[in-house]
Amino acid sequence: MEISRASDRPFTHGEQDRFTGEVSLGSTIADPQGTNVGIVHFVAGARTRWHRHPGGQFLIGISGRGRVRSRGESGHLLLPGDVIRVGPDEWHFHGGAPDAPMAHYAVNGGGAPDWAEPVTDEEYSEGF
């Protein structure tokens, strides 16, 4: 058994080549098969770039109000307790709502994500 205590987790600032706006990341736990769990905090309007995970991703809302959208699809609201599954290699973004911050757990399957271009303001607003 492995335990990750909240008091032992340092948070780091999200890198500009992966995020737009102020984002804080907290790593929690990873297993030998490559699955990892992290906590991500977004200020209002902050978001990831377009990206995909080879092993897929689950997003579990903790607080606030967020946005999640896959390329070419309508967007979805992420609220505390909501769970969104993003399929393997599905291009998507997630972040805080324009007027509210958001925090979520991210459960990522094996393999490093592929990061692409920033989400434009138009893409961030479209489909919600």
Question: Predicted regions span which residues?
Answer:
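A short hydrophobic beta-strand segment most commonly corresponding to one strand
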Residues: 85, 99-118
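Ligand-binding pocket scaffold of soluble enzyme catalytic domains
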Residues: 32, 46, 68, 99-105, ...
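Short beta-strand His + acidic residue motifs that chelate non-heme Fe in jelly-roll/DSBH
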Residues: 48-50, 68-69, 91-98
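A short, N-terminal "cap"/entry segment at the start of jelly-roll beta-barrel domains
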Residues: 1-35, 114-128
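Short acidic-glycine-tyrosine-enriched beta hairpin
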Residues: 72-89
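Short, conserved beta-strand element in jelly-roll/cupin
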Residues: 41-43, 52-68, 107-109
